[in-house]
């Protein structure tokens, strides 16, 4: 069964996910998760790249590249927003800008991109191979 999603539905889904992501990133992590912050950045952006690539790009390399660039930019903007939010509030609601978070954001994006490109190459290689029954029937 193939699920058909309209462009308007994709945009609504994207805006909802974006709003939840911003809200989630602007809150301070509970104590039990603070030592896993870097891994959570990598995992979140890995899943986000997979989600948006499946939603918008399919097998289009350029759209995937745009998605990865947009998510990387989002990651940097969120880090700056976290730092800025601390200066707006009377109490600290989040940590400081952390270049390590940006590093792990990029690592998560690159990890998904590597898997996605390997999948596309594998699909292309196996699709390009003629079936043995077709090759035998041509003779």
How would you name each of these model-derived features?
Residues 1-100, 106-139:
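Bulky hydrophobic segments
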């Amino acid at each position: 069964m193939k699920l058909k999603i309209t462009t308007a539905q994709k945009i609504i889904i994207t805006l909802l996910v974006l709003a939840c992501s911003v809200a989630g990133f602007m809150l301070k992590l509970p104590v039990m998760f603070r030592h896993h912050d870097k891994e959570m950045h990598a995992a979140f952006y890995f899943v986000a790249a997979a989600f948006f690539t499946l939603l918008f790009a399919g097998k289009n390399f350029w759209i995937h590249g745009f998605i990865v660039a947009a998510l990387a930019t989002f990651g940097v903007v969120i880090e700056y927003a976290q730092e800025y939010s601390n200066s707006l509030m009377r109490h600290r609601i989040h940590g400081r800008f952390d270049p390590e978070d940006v590093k792990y954001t990029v690592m998560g994006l690159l990890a998904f991109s590597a898997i996605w490109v390997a999948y596309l190459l594998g699909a292309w290689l196996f699709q390009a191979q003629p079936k043995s029954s077709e090759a035998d029937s041509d003779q």
